[in-house]
């Protein structure tokens, strides 16, 4: 009896030291992680330590080669890692989304000073353009989007940002935006700039500026877009789109076409994009 009792006590002791295993289910069969101070998924640890706001963003960073474990590049978001492992990012994202990189590149290229400007961000989404403008010193941004709940929390709680969700930019007028708007930035999808710019320009003060992202897949005809399954690769089509927008903005809207620059990064589907600078005079 004494032997059996000792064995039972030893088994209980061992059981208490076995870490609990949690799994996320059949859809992610390999996403099990150990929770009692032992190993976890890399993407989960990145979120736990505050590197990223969600596992999805952490996954993208790992797949893009931005995460280092003990000075070695990580390649798998689901890799099991000690919670105390030495983790580093090759380059911290300066903005809440990739869109900020596009606008920042354009403002730098055009040497456009937005300090103290009153701005409107049409198609704000997560807020990459808004974040870029705030970091460059604008006094206020109206973050406008037809969707809801997408704007990053740090922008949503910034007193320089006026959040205007569930708002269609095509229906805006000066009653919606108190104050004088000096600058409008545009990053809209599934709609041509030819539909967005007319009401936007009406909001601008004289000598106000527009910086708009040109997305060829939403400017080309349906036939051209369907050919490449939504990706426009033909440089001749790019030229036609830019020429058509130049003609529309200068002749129909009476704007001054100040310049155009290619985006430093591709769109999500691999589309080449451009940013145009327009001035109201």
Model regions and ranges:
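Conserved S-adenosyl-L-methionine
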Residues: 135-140
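Short, glycine-/aromatic-enriched active-site segment of Class I SAM-dependent methyltransferases
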Residues: 216-234
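Core SAM-dependent methyltransferase catalytic element
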Residues: 265-281
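Conserved beta-strand signature within the Rossmann-like core of class I S-adenosyl-L-methionine
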Residues: 207-214
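S-adenosyl-L-methionine
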Residues: 148-179
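A basic, amphipathic helix-loop patch mediating RNA/tRNA/ribosome contacts
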Residues: 32-85, 118
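Conserved class I S-adenosyl-L-methionine
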Residues: 116-123
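A short glycine-rich, Lys/Arg-flanked "PGG" loop and its adjoining helix->strand segment in the class I
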Residues: 198-206
């Amino acid at each position: 009896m004494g032997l059996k009792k000792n064995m039972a006590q030893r088994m209980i002791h061992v059981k208490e030291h076995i870490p609990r295993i949690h799994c996320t289910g059949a859809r992610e069969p390999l996403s099990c992680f150990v929770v009692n101070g032992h190993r976890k998924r890399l993407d989960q640890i990145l979120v736990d330590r505050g590197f990223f706001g969600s596992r999805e963003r952490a996954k993208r960073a790992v797949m893009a080669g931005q995460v280092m474990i003990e000075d070695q590049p990580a390649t798998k978001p689901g890799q099991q890692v000690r919670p105390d492992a030495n983790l580093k990012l090759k380059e911290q994202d300066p903005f809440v989304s990739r869109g900020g990189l596009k606008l920042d590149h354009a403002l730098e290229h055009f040497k456009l000073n937005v300090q103290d400007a009153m701005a409107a961000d049409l198609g704000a989404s997560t807020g990459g353009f808004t974040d870029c403008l705030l970091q460059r010193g604008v006094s206020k941004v109206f973050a406008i989007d037809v969707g809801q709940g997408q704007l990053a929390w740090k922008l949503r709680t910034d007193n320089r940002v006026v959040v205007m969700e569930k708002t269609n930019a095509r229906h805006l007028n000066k009653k919606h935006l108190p104050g004088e708007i000096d600058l409008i930035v545009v990053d809209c999808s599934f709609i041509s700039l030819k539909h967005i710019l007319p009401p936007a320009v009406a909001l601008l003060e004289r000598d106000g500026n527009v910086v708009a992202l040109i997305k060829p897949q939403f400017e080309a005809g349906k036939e051209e877009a369907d050919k490449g399954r939504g990706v426009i690769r033909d440089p001749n089509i790019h030229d036609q789109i830019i020429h058509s927008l130049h003609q529309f903005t200068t002749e129909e809207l009476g704007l001054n076409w100040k310049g155009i620059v290619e985006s430093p990064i591709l769109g999500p589907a691999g589309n080449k994009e451009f940013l145009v600078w327009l001035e109201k005079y």
